[in-house]
Amino acid sequence: MQESKALVRVQQISVLYLVIWTISPFMEIDMIWRIGAFAAFGLWLICAISRGLHLERIHLLALGFVVLVVIVNIIENNGFSKILRPIQYYVMVLFFIMGHFYRGKWKELFFIVPIILIFLIYFNFKSASTVMNDPTIARLLVRNDEEIYTYLRQGIGGYGLLYPQVVTFPVLVMWIFKAYRNKRMYSLIGIAWLVSFVLFVINANYSIAITGSVFSLIILLFYKGHSAGLAFVVSVGLFITLMLMILNLDGFRNMLLEFFDGTAVAKKINDLVASSESGAAEGSINDRVIAYQGTINTIFRFPIIGGLWWESGGGHSALGGMFAQYGIFGGYIFCKIFYTVPNYYKKEYRFKQIRNIANANLVVLLFVSLLDSVSYSFLGMVLFVTPILYENIIEWDGLTANNEEELKVEKEEVKNVPVTLPKTT
């Protein structure tokens, strides 16, 4: 028993380190942190095997995908010189296996959510205050070169810090609401996180982050349907409506330009208008159009196996890029992993509120992965923090699979109750 507790504790510390590693700007840079991450996973794996880790067919396929990535990388680079370049794929599969291990055991990790939120609060406020003083830093932090290292080491993050929170946003909002009635301290931490997130996302002015957050919140609050696909179509409809309003309603466009004056969002609005007037994409929109065209061209050229070489697609689309680079197999593995959490909870807990949360969660995951890249920084939030948030909500509201079965039985019993008509005289 004591040994089992020790194994659990080692795993808890390992998971906490791994999630902090994925979200911390200062841990993005130096190799020492990556070595620490692989050491943490090694310790976790030893403990998991001791506790009875088992894999299903999908996990073996995911490991096969890692083997494919490694082989292609070695062939392309004539050796192991860039073996860590596709690190997000290694982390994605490892976290997928770890998340599967915790199904039915998520209570062991409940403690990490407030800790992660406290880290995020600090990073968000630090980053928001920095980009408020110098808005150009937000665009600089999207780049991947040594020029940004000074900022990262200070805890100032950009894309890799903000977007993992965006794809978790609707679940966190509902978690804060539920925590207010069940765990008041958690709720206070959550509200502080929400304030820091809003400040960061508004001042960083990443247009996809703002749009994805707003649309997912709209779906969470107002969409009551069953289908996540329909929810996504509704979101696309809202997106198209917004674009048409910007192009055709001068008052609305001017209001947005005034609100976002001097920011990247204002630049994108101007690029959109210029593209419409010239009949061709302009500025940053042109960059994205070229990237998406490159991805689509590669998918049509190599629909089965993909281009395989690094950056086969044009970029700016994680989902499209996986199909372009690794074909049907890679795209399938990405979808199974990246969308697994909301799909699982929507299937296992068919309660209306869980369905609403899962639909909003799927919409923002699809929106971001279709229109932007995904790095390993997403994976701690997507595959560890998000399921814990679902589990907290389910526990606080007393929603269990058994309860649902009881509800089904009750409904069947009501259906089968014989109706006795009153006797007539």
Kindly give the residue locations of the regions a language model identified.
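Glycine- and aromatic-enriched alpha-helical transmembrane segments of multi-pass membrane proteins
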Residues: K423-T425
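TM-adjacent membrane-interface loops and short helices in multi-pass inner/ER membrane proteins
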Residues: A264-G314, I328-Y332
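Mature, Sec-exported extracytoplasmic domains of Gram-positive
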Residues: L256-F260, I269
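Hydrophobic transmembrane helix bundles of membrane-integrated enzymes that assemble
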Residues: M1-M255, G294, F300, S317-V419
